[in-house]
């Protein structure tokens, strides 16, 4: 069954390129991006993992840990790293899970629970549903789920934008409008009364419609 926003991210133990982890312990009190790819040594995935490595400093600045996953063995992940660096200029600098028994992929709803066997002999097409992004909060709750098709590489700048929004709205009773970026105006949520808003934003707010109150982004 697919995970939904607000669900507790399932816990698991796994072998990674940086050793064995217990997922919830590994999360600690951090935000986390768990992202999966269909298969090692494939073209789109090569660009994705290299791009994620290039952007890792941006995730670090936000206090976000990143971890990759595929059903390939950890040894394959390690061998593939040189190719990724050759193509993109950056090798994975984050742990990558080897989900060879498919258990985590099934636990997170990326493969049907009825899927049998192991990763051996599986093709990228067999794993076509395993190109997901899960953003998980420090409370271990799922905050966002993205599922991409085989032929479309992910936009990790958008993942960073969503994290900026999630972290801001976790601290302040605001929401972010379409295409919002860090530093731009935000919208007060309905939970904030006008009397409260006057105290929080004495300079006032813009009201293009009675149900829309636009204010400057609060300081984090």
Regions found by a protein language model. Name each.
Residues 1-220:
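Chalcogenol-based redox active-site neighborhoods
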């Amino acid at each position: 069954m697919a995970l939904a926003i607000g669900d507790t991210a399932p816990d698991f133990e796994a072998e990674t390129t940086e050793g064995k982890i217990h997922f919830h312990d590994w999360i600690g009190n951090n935000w986390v991006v768990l992202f999966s790819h269909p298969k090692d040594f494939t073209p789109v995935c090569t660009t994705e993992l290299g791009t994620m490595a290039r952007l890792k400093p941006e995730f670090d600045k936000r206090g976000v840990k990143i971890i990759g996953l595929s059903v390939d063995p950890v040894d394959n992940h390690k061998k593939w790293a040189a190719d990724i660096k050759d193509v993109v200029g950056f090798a994975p600098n984050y742990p990558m899970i080897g989900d060879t028994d498919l258990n985590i992929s099934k636990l997170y709803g990326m493969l049907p629970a009825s899927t049998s066997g192991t990763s051996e002999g599986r093709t990228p097409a067999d794993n076509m549903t395993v190109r997901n992004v899960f953003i998980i909060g420090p409370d271990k709750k799922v905050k966002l789920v993205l599922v991409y098709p085989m032929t479309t590489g992910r936009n990790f700048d958008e993942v960073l934008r969503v994290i900026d929004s999630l972290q801001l709205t976790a601290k302040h009773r605001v929401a972010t409008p379409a295409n919002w970026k860090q530093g731009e105006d935000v919208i007060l949520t309905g939970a904030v009364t006008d009397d409260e808003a006057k105290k929080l934003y004495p300079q006032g707010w813009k009201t293009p419609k009675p149900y829309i109150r636009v204010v400057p982004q609060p300081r984090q």
